[in-house]
Design a protein with these regions (language model features):
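Active-/binding-site microenvironments in catalytic and ligand-binding cores
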Residues: 1-209
Length: 209
């Protein structure tokens, strides 16, 4: 068994979406002064590698704390998108030998995570084509994951991809940190923090093969 960590490390310098407060990690106790260590955390529900709940964009969509735990685990196919390809196309999803009927999650490996921490990470990243989105909506997936800041373009006015996927009751995982050479198939886990009215949550996403 091998476990692949698909998560970015959180710290005070974690990149955030424009207009979003930066996370704060502050040491509030030390062994020298208090006999123990403790850290104060302040961050939004969509910081770092995280899940979008249907409630994030759908008025009556389910919150993370309303979803069964089973939705956060399942069989995943890693879809390799050619380097610097601006569009994730339907044929890229169908290119593998895995039957989509056996898949719970599609994880899109575009390589964009290499720009994590730079300004380029927020601009011109690959997004789904209309055909790829239609294929996803036609299947009964639990969720879809991206190694980019958002499923939609940075200047999207209607958040069509978000609204379409979340509107079907699926979850979206963003800011995945998918490593080179990862197998095309594995068991995916992305459990969120448990808190009330959760529109999203940071996760420790892993793929087990």
């Amino acid at each position: 068994m091998k476990i692949y960590d698909l998560s970015h490390t959180l710290d005070n310098d974690t990149p955030v979406y424009q207009g979003t407060p930066h996370p704060v990690f502050k040491k509030i106790a030390s062994i020298e002064n208090d006999g123990f260590r403790e850290t104060y955390l302040s961050l939004t529900s969509h910081t770092g590698t995280h899940i979008d709940a249907p409630y994030h964009m759908i008025g009556k969509g389910k919150k993370l704390d309303q979803l069964p735990l089973e939705i956060f685990a399942g069989r995943a196919a890693v879809v390799h998108v050619p380097a610097d390809e601006p569009i994730i196309r339907k044929r890229m999803i169908l290119n593998g030998s895995v039957s989509l009927q056996d898949i719970d999650f599609l994880l899109f490996f575009t390589g964009w995570n290499k720009y994590w921490g730079s300004r380029k990470y927020f601009k011109n990243y690959p997004v789904l084509s209309p055909g790829a989105l239609e294929l996803i909506l036609a299947n009964n997936f639990k969720g879809v994951g991206f190694d980019t800041i958002s499923a939609d373009k940075e200047d999207s006015a209607d958040w069509k991809i978000h609204n379409s996927i979340l509107g079907k009751g699926m979850i979206i995982i963003e800011n995945l940190n998918i490593p080179e050479g990862i197998p095309a198939l594995g068991d995916f886990f992305c459990f969120p923090l448990l808190f009330n009215d959760a529109d999203g949550s940071p996760v420790r996403a892993v793929l087990i093969t």
